[in-house]
Amino acid sequence: MDKLFKTSFRFIIRFLQILSLPVVFPYFLLSFLACLITSKNYESLPYNYPPEIRFKKVYRLVSMWLYIKGIKVVTVNDKIIPKKPVLVVANHKSNLDPLVLIKAFGRLKNSPPLTFVAKIELKDTVLFKLMKLIDCVFIDRKNIRQIANALETQQQLIRQGTAIAVFAEGTRILSNDIGEFKPGALKVAYNAFVPILPVSIVGSLGKMESNKRLKEHGVKKSSNYEVKVIFNKLINPISFNQIDSNNLANNIRSIISDAYTSEKPSND
């Protein structure tokens, strides 16, 4: 009976959301255009656009997109997020994951602004301008010098008060397994001496993926409308500074995997 009630309630909510789309969608398009214009102006006049303005624009745009898609972001243990910058390390199941993290961080008072480390290939996408608006750091894995420069950029952003998120698996894992974590993704935490916040994202598997790609991997898209963001216990730098990065990566992977497994929806 409880499940039936939840299903019925969800149906009503989604129905009302769909009815509101003729109003919401044009506003979303206008907001998207405004973000693109702001991003272009930010490149030429960066000091005219402080982080609180730029990040807020992107947060609002992401919130509207999630509303349009009918996706609800649920956070667990969000009170442990500190006001100071952290390195967020999360699992990666879908292109939806960065948007979910933006939503989870952006709606919390006093949380630091959040940006991402992303692959250089994303520069060829329409999202590049939006990513630049929140100071995303792009990495070319084939260029050692560029990787070093990107690491310095990450440290600079942290000094300026921005939290950085990395998907340490390095790619989307289209299964319920958690992939191996790359220790290089944690280097900025060592260099900048900042806490690490392990985050488990549950319920995004297969979302924003083509049916062809899902079929190739034998994956069924999650039918759950909720995506859960679990903030695991903060790891302070004094506790990992002397630990080998490979061991630290394995420890963080275990933390994220345990929380993911315990919260994974049955239909994922």
Swiss-Prot record:
This is Probable 1-acyl-sn-glycerol-3-phosphate acyltransferase. It holds the Pfam family Acyltransferase. Converts lysophosphatidic acid (LPA) into phosphatidic acid by incorporating acyl moiety at the 2 position. One of its GO terms (molecular function) is 1-acylglycerol-3-phosphate O-acyltransferase activity. Belongs to the 1-acyl-sn-glycerol-3-phosphate acyltransferase family. The keyword Lipid metabolism applies. Keywords: Acyltransferase, Lipid biosynthesis, Lipid metabolism, Phospholipid biosynthesis, Phospholipid metabolism, Transferase. Pathway: Phospholipid metabolism; CDP-diacylglycerol biosynthesis; CDP-diacylglycerol from sn-glycerol 3-phosphate: step 2/3. A motif (HXXXXD motif) lies at residues 92-97. It catalyses: a 1-acyl-sn-glycero-3-phosphate + an acyl-CoA = a 1,2-diacyl-sn-glycero-3-phosphate + CoA. It is an enzyme of class 2 (transferase). GO terms for biological process: CDP-diacylglycerol biosynthetic process; phosphatidic acid biosynthetic process. It comes from the Bacteria. Signal peptide: none annotated. GO terms for cellular component: membrane. The HXXXXD motif is essential for acyltransferase activity and may constitute the binding site for the phosphate moiety of the glycerol-3-phosphate. Its EC number is 2.3.1.51. CDD domains: LPLAT_AGPAT-like. The keyword Cell membrane does not apply. NCBIfam families: AGP_acyltrn.
